[in-house]
Each structure stands twice: as structure tokens, then as C-alpha cells.
Amino acid sequence: NRFLARNCVFLSIIPKLFPNLSVNLLLRTPQKISYITLTMNDFRFLVITCLIAMLSCTSSLAQLAKRSGSVSKSQSADFQIQASKKIDRLVGADFRRKQIRPLGKANDAEFMRRAYLNAIGRIPSYEEAVSFLNDESPDKRNNLIDSLLGSYGYNMHMFNWWADLLRATDEFEDTSGAPYIKWIKDSIAENKSYKSMVHELISATGGGWQNGAVGYYVRDQGMLKDNMANTTRIFLGTRIECAQCHNHPFDSWKQMDFYQMAAFTNGIKTAKSHLSNYLEDKEDMDGVSRDLIDVSRLIRYAVYDFSIQDTGTGTIRLPKDYKYRDGDPGERVGAKSLSQFGKTVKVSTRSKSTDPGKSRVKFADWLVSPDNPRFTKVIANRMWKRVMATGLFEPLDNFSSASEPSNSALMSYLEELLIDLDYDLLAFQKILYKSYSFQLRPNAIQHPDRSPYHFNGRQLKRLSAEQIWDSLLTLKIKEPDKRLGNGYTGDAIMYRGRPVLVGKKSMRDLYNEVMEIESGDEVWDYTKKLHDQIKSDKGVKSGGGESMQMMMAYNAGKKYG
């Protein structure tokens, strides 16, 4: 039918061209379905059929090419080169305006070391260095960038960056951070867009062993106001924590602004907290063995406490000592995004819990939307600093109303480019790495803090702890990027610091079984049963060494390590 509608003009002239051909057409309209009946006494019908098929295929292929072109722009080598050249033109224009004499181009050895340390977080091995330095191809620098950014080393180095940004750790007090760590690593490995990652983090709900993104809130459990302060610092480049207690003395943020933002995530609760409390009460009873208490705590901390059941009320009460005219002490206010960042989103206060379960989703939608241009500006600047060593505005997380990028035209283009790439951070970095600006010689002149740095080569900086460690490993072992993790437990059940029931039951299994339990007596019976299973596990009896080896092999096979 689509074919008939597309080619109706051509079909209408068939009877005039071929009088021996009888053609009856009912062309498609929005209300009707089209049919075609052909009676042929002339072999020329075969020719017509072929021509019609060619027309239809040509149209379909053109549409397919158009669609695939928009999807693969970030993979287009020509697009990357043109974008890199535009960045260089904008940097060069700033040189002329500021009368800066550009540094020369870094030699191959300087470029190689910089590329390795920046892209995968370590120095090149001897073999890698010899291979690159002896390469005489004109595109060897771009080829090296492609190779490094496509390696496992890039994933691990990028994980270090994300872990630092999100303050991710192996443990959250008494709860394992393994699901959160794995979610971050998996997101990097599949090259999930920055926009998608942030939206998933902010709107995350469920259990950690089903959705590791809930670790973003479990990390700050019981400190939701601090979590919101970190959210605005990380994703909006703005520090509003000062306004938690009073209006900001040097910026436009008010205490009301802080509480309206905090309302988006206020009221988040862990799943089935009544059963968690039941286990805690049981642990305090006389006659309960220490072993059973430890198993009970395993269930409480790793299952119930690592889950988000309620996504927030969307309202919050002002503190009792609130003293400003725009609100009363103890007054309940609705969530509202910061008006300084463009179009706002609000949650009403008409009921105690307005739009239950949707306030965080509304916040996540607004945070990553075009209505909030600050979101794009902040991550574009973070990526520029990651590659070029110094941000277009500094500090990265304190962009105030008085802040101005050192190169406004370049900042605007980087924002435009990131949107054009659909927030593909890998493609964005590749463009920066392939620019001539990245290849300038290092700038050894110390730049004053908190003053605009008009880019003229990467400033020298100390290596991070991770870069030092991975570089030392490069001197000692072969293929350092392929080494297994150092005791990363994946989804193994950890009891007293040792993996148990390896290959028999995982934390995902444990989570699913526990979350089906509805009563306190049932969860206590399950706890005792799990205790017996753990005590009979050979890994525990042998001191854990055998179990640890089994766990590492098991996790490596399942790609957890």
C-alpha cells in the first residue's frame, strides 16, 4: 500500500504506454485499503514490474540511508575530522584575540605518552612504544587514538573517572557496593550515553541486585539533602549546599531554592523496611548465636538496605528555624527546579504525597532536557578538562552567575557538538583527541588558580594514584589491561569477608528469594535455612581460600571481574 501511494503517478500512465495491459487500481487513502488487479496479454508487464520495484527500492534505500546517517554520525571519520578542525579554528581565533603565540607540535614520544596516560591511564609498554615510534604511516596518531579508545584499558580508566565523580566505593557502611560498581562498568562497556546514565541514576528504583543504579542513593542513605547537594554539584556544576542553612552570601541561591530542590528526592525509603526491622529485633534477642546474627545482617544490609521502594513524595518541610519571608518555619513546600537554569518543573503541595513515585522521574526528565542547558555545559567542560587538563571554566563544580568561559565560542560549540553526538562521551573525546590542539607541546608555565586559562597546550599536571599504579604494573607484567580484578566479588554472597555458596547461589538469587517473603516469621525461617547452607559450604570450612579461587574463576567466566 505504501508502494502504491508512493508511485501512483507512475502507475497512472501505464495504460497509455501499454494498451494491451488492463490495470484496475484503487489507490490508498487514509480511509481505504488499496488493491491492484492486473490482467496481462503483453510480456511488457514484466518490464513494468521491474521498473516499479526499482522505484520502490530506491525510495526505501534513500530513507534508510537518511535514518542510518543520523544514527552513525558519531562513528563517521569525516565528521570527527571536521569537528576537530572546527575546534582548532576556535582555539586559533582565541590565540589571535589574546595575542597568544601558540606552542609547537608535540613530537611522537610526547604525544604517545600523553595519549596513553590520558586515554587508558598508563604509560605505554616497551613493545607498544617501539611499535608506534617505528610506524611511518601519516595517520598513525589518529590510528593510535582509535586503538586506545577501543580498548579495555579505556573502559577501566573511564571507570576510575566515573567512580571518583559519583564517589562510588566497594562498600557502603555495612552494604556491598558491588552492584553499583558493576552497573557503572557495564554502562561504560556498552557506551551508554551520558544523558541515559544520568537519567537512570536519578530515577533509579528497585533492588541493587536488579538495578545497580540505586547505589547512587544507597551511597548517601539517610543523607538525602547531602545527596541533592552532590547532584547539583556533579551534574549542574553548582554548589548550593551553603543554602541548606541560609541564603547564599555570595550567589543568588536562597535557602528556599535548596529545600525545593531537595523535595524531589525527599521521602525515599528502602524496600520492606518492616521486615528489616523485624530481623534487627530478632538479632537483639537472647540465645541467638553470633553466626545467625551475621547471616541476618547479611540479608538486612545486602538486600533490604540496598533497595529503593519509594521514589519520593515531591514535598518537604522547611526547617523549624526558617527565618526568611518567603516561607514559614515547618511549612510544607513542593519541589521546584532552579529557575536560573531555564524552564522550571514543579510539584504541587495540595496533598501530603503529590504524584507519588513521579517526583524523581520529573526531576530526572528536567535535569537532562534541553530546558536545562546547564546540564550540557557542565559535562562538555568536564570532558574538555579530562582531555586538555584545564577546563574552559574553573572550578568545574562552582559555575556561578558571574562565571565566564575562557573561550565562549568554543564552549558553545562543544555544547552543540555534544548534543549532536547524542551525549556519546566516547565519540566526543575521540574528536578532542584528534584535534591539533591536543597535539600541542605541553605548557610548563604554571597558571594561576581560578583565573581563565586561554588554552595554549596542556598544562603539566601530576599523575593520579591510579595512573601511577597502572604505570608501575605496565613495567612489571604483560598485557596489564587484561588482568583480572583484585578480589572483585561480582554478585557472590560474601559472609565474613569470604565468598560462599559459589556456583550454587548468587546475590541475585538471594535477593529474589528474600523479596518474595511477606512475613517476619518467614524471613526468620529463611535466615536460619541460609545459615545452615553457609555452614555446610566447603569454602567456609576450608578457611575460604578454595572458595575465593572458585569465586574469581566463576566471576571471570561470567564477566564480572
Q: Where are each of the predicted segments found?
A:
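Short N-terminal segments immediately surrounding and downstream of signal-peptide cleavage
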Residues: 65-85
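Bacterial N-terminal signal peptides that target proteins for export
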Residues: 37-47
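Bacterial N-terminal signal peptides
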Residues: 48-56
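Short hydrophobic targeting helices and cationic amphipathic motifs
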Residues: 2-4, 8-11, 21, 25
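Short, Lys/Arg-enriched N-terminal segments with co-localized hydrophobic residues
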Residues: 20, 24-39
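Long, His/Glu/Asp-enriched segments that create or flank divalent metal/ion-associated functional microenvironments
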Residues: 473-561
